[in-house]
Regions:
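A boundary/linker detector
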Residues: 1-17, 36-37, 95-128
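Short amphipathic alpha-helical segments with coiled-coil-like heptad repeat character
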Residues: 30, 89-97
Length: 128
């Protein structure tokens, strides 16, 4: 098996850190149905990663959904889900609309983001 590149390792670490921050921010609670049983929650992107990396780790672009709401509602009813997000989080929706686009992070930027997220988790100081 091929060894992971340093960039791929950073990407994996940032995925993990951003999920941890989102779980904490949203109190391990599905933002759609309110389920809070400590299991089956997922970090979900508003603007999909496939639309570009610019917002992949932007915490404003993420929310916690339970497994059911993520797969059976968010992905199957994108218009309804988008309307819900815009009504529920209008400031975040506006921010995302203004900041979407294609962007390629440098390795230094990835390292800086990783350090910032690690520090936020360590000190329980979130800047959402």
């Amino acid at each position: 098996m091929a060894k992971k590149s340093d960039r791929k390792k950073l990407i994996d670490q940032l995925d993990k850190l951003s999920k941890q921050l989102i779980y904490q921010r949203d109190n391990y609670t599905c933002q759609h149905c309110g389920k809070n049983d400590g299991r089956d929650y997922q970090a979900s992107h508003v603007i999909p990663v496939s639309a570009g990396m610019k917002l992949r780790w932007d915490l404003q672009n993420m929310k916690v959904l339970c497994y059911h709401c993520h797969l059976n509602w968010w992905h199957k009813n994108p218009l309804e889900a988008s309307d819900w997000f815009n009504r529920t989080f209008p400031d975040r929706a506006k921010y995302l609309e203004e900041n979407r686009g294609i962007y390629k992070f440098t390795e230094a930027e990835l390292e800086e983001l990783k350090a910032d997220y690690t520090e936020q988790l360590k000190n329980n100081t979130h800047r959402f």
